[in-house]
Regions:
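Transmembrane helices with small-residue packing motifs
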Residues: 45-54, 124-160, 215-217, 246, ...
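Interfacial helix-loop-helix hairpins and adjacent transmembrane helices
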Residues: 2-21, 50, 56, 75-127, ...
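Solvent-exposed, membrane-proximal periplasmic/extracellular interface segments of envelope transport
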Residues: 163-257, 282, 311-333, 340
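Short helix-loop junctions at transmembrane helix boundaries
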Residues: 45-62, 140-143, 431, 472, ...
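Extracytoplasmic/periplasmic membrane-proximal domains and adjacent transmembrane bundles
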Residues: 12, 241-243, 274-460, 469-472, ...
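Hydrophobic transmembrane alpha-helices and their membrane-interface caps
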Residues: 1, 64, 72, 463-563, ...
């Protein structure tokens, strides 16, 4: 018996005809799968706030790249194929990779077709098992981004003196710098030299720059560094707070809260607001995940109260303005001259020194000059005493406001706040008339992001269904492709559960990107299954008298098993591009991994579904058509 040559040279005319036919067969599906990936990612543009600013560049980049890709698929790719695919060709069966894949895959798909209920049951069980996994995951707005630094924000009592704050700052900086992983420390107390910083002198901000991780002690993490420093920095009268410089500034600008979560207490009376704030603080203590708990001071500020005695000043022929002018000059200062340095002018002010301004006996002995009676001590003209009052009055929407602040560490943000809300509702119950509380900080962003995603997800599914309908000109096959999406979620749910990742906007963006990838693989499979049905109809006609169930089964298996390499290649390209990100490190990898994880897991499970279940569902659909309509619906591949 004479063996057939493994290589065959095809004439140019026939080669161009084959290339044209192959491009018509595949390009439509590839084009629409690319369009589906583009359109499924468009709802990311609906994200607002921080999440929008973070993911819009990603959406723009991906959209522009895929738009160019979709154009090249139907224009440049066929031309390049005609140039490079020439000479002698090997049949598909001569490729050892194809033979190996078909040898492994064909018995498996035959078993799946034979044991239909078992195959579908296993997939449904896996889908059902993923639901409680997703429900048990924690919730957070965005994955914590490691900035490579720490912002230490302790607060002390409102009436603290400048000298005491300076001493505390020096002690804290010395302790912080003693940590082996700390590179440098820079701290400040009070506000910066700008009109937009309203920080009181009791607020300290210290930026702690860390060394590269390669220089850290073995087994040390950033959380362990914070815990170790926090235990060393327990100073009486000082409440510690730990965050990061960039996220702290973002939170303060967007929500007005310098911690992860803030409970805003609104009311009409500062004393009542402070009492409610203390009750809330006591209820929040002990909740797992609540750290750096602190009530923003509403009382405790020290004021010098000067009550002028009108009868006494009248006896000395003085007016209230005369006495106020002396007090203002002594405490606030008065301009005595102006100095000129080059092109700049500076006013020179004079007032009492710090020690005298804070010294009540010295203020009482302040001499007020009179006409005809000589200097008179201020104590003889007014009652002087130190009283307490609010160090700062905060208002929002025309209501007085107090705030209970805390950070979340060692637990997800959503679960921590949810438990805190339940505890407060049970403890406080209904607030008195004129008082109410509101949750703010990063939790506010979490709620906004979840509301937006609840609108986006159904929108994504509708867009994908419409795009697939135009790809196949069949609502039934579009729905058949859409069924693959829940099974793609299985892998995403499993991998984020075992990786220990919380649900966030980044994870949701990863699932949105996964939808397009899963549908792309499914479209490639359905193209070849429809091609097998066309061959069956061309050979035996389209009637129940000429087509049997065995014919449908064999041609479906043949369509699924043949040309297995491009189907595997579609999945492999995605995995080869995504998997290296899981082992990436450095700034930014903390945000990228939650995006990539659901895509990696989903691509794997969707590939299993497409290879094993899609042919089975396709076969069952064709058997139903043959039984009910007497023929099968064949989707022709259009140019």
């Amino acid at each position: 018996m004479k063996l057939r040559k493994p290589y065959k040279k095809i004439p140019r005319a026939e080669r161009m005809r084959i290339i044209e036919m192959a491009c018509k067969q595949v390009s439509r599906g590839v084009f629409f799968s690319t369009v589906i990936i583009i359109t499924s990612f468009l709802p990311v543009f609906l994200l607002t706030g921080q999440e929008g600013k973070l993911f819009h560049p990603l959406a723009f980049t991906k959209t522009f790249i895929l738009v160019v890709d979709a154009i090249l698929v139907v224009t440049l790719a066929p031309v390049l194929i005609s140039f490079f695919m020439r000479g002698r060709f090997r049949p598909e069966s001569a490729n050892p990779v194809n033979r190996f894949l078909e040898k492994v895959y064909e018995p498996v798909i035959r078993a799946c077709v034979k044991w239909r209920k078992t195959t579908i049951g296993i997939m449904l069980i896996a889908l059902a098992a993923s639901v409680p996994m997703v429900m048990s995951l924690g919730r957070e707005f965005m994955p914590p981004l490691d900035e490579g630094s720490i912002l230490f924000m302790p607060v002390t009592l409102p009436d603290v003196s400048n000298s005491e704050v300076k001493r505390i700052l020096q002690v804290q900086d010395k302790i912080l710098a003693s940590e082996p992983e700390v590179k440098s420390v820079l701290g400040k107390a009070g506000r910066a030299n700008t009109a937009t910083d309203n920080s009181p002198i009791s607020m300290i901000e210290t930026i702690v720059m860390l060394k590269p991780r390669s220089e850290w002690r073995k087994g040390v993490t950033k959380d362990s560094i914070i815990n170790e420093l926090n235990s060393k920095l327990q100073i009486p009268g000082v409440t510690n707070g730990w965050t990061q410089p960039i996220i702290n500034r973002i939170n303060m600008l967007s929500t007005g809260i310098r911690t992860d979560v803030g409970v805003k207490v609104y009311g009409q009376n500062l004393d009542s607001i402070y009492e409610f704030s203390q009750v809330i603080k006591r209820d929040l203590e002990g909740i797992p995940g609540v750290k750096d708990l602190y009530v923003e001071p509403i009382t405790g500020g020290k004021y010098i109260d000067v009550n002028i005695n009108r009868e006494e000043i009248a006896r000395y022929n003085l007016s209230i303005d005369d006495v106020n002018a002396v007090i203002e000059t002594a405490l606030g200062g008065a301009r005595i001259t102006t100095t000129v340095e080059g092109r700049q002018r500076f006013s020179v002010n004079a007032r009492f020194g710090q020690d005298y301004r804070n010294n009540l006996p010295a203020l009482k002995n302040l001499q007020v000059q009179t006409q005809g009676f000589g200097p008179v001590p201020l104590d003889a003209l007014a009652g002087i005493k130190i009283t307490e009052g609010p160090p700062m009055i905060n208002s929002e929407n025309a209501l007085l406001r107090g705030t209970v602040l805390f950070n979340v560490r060692g637990r997800d943000l959503g679960g921590t706040v949810q438990e805190a809300q339940q505890k407060l509702n049970a403890s406080i119950g209904k607030m008195p008339k004129g008082f109410f509380i509101d949750w703010s900080g990063e939790y506010e962003n979490l709620i906004r992001g979840e509301k937006t995603l609840k609108l986006i997800m159904p929108f994504v599914l509708v867009i994908i269904f419409i795009a697939m309908y135009f790809a196949f000109d069949s609502a039934r096959e579009a729905l058949l492709s859409l069924i693959s999406l829940p099974f793609a979620l299985i892998g995403g749910a499993f991998i984020i559960y075992f990786w220990g990742v919380n649900l966030s906007v980044a994870v949701a963006v990863g699932f949105i990107a996964l939808f397009g990838l899963a549908v792309e693989t499914n479209i490639v499979m359905i193209i070849y299954l429809n091609d097998a049905m066309q061959q069956l109809v061309a050979k035996k006609g389209n009637s129940r008298e000429t087509i049997t169930k065995d014919d449908l089964r064999e041609y479906t298996i043949n369509g699924a098993a043949k040309r297995l390499r491009p189907k595997i290649m579609t999945v492999s390209v995605s995995l080869f591009a995504l998997v290296p990100i899981l082992w990436s490190s450095g700034v930014g990898s903390d945000v990228m991994k939650p995006i990539v994880l659901p895509m990696v897991g989903g691509v794997i499970t969707s590939a299993i579904y497409v290879l094993l279940v899609t042919p089975l569902i396709f076969l069952m659909n064709k058997e139903y058509e043959l039984k009910k309509f007497g023929k099968i619906e064949v989707t022709e591949v259009k140019p």
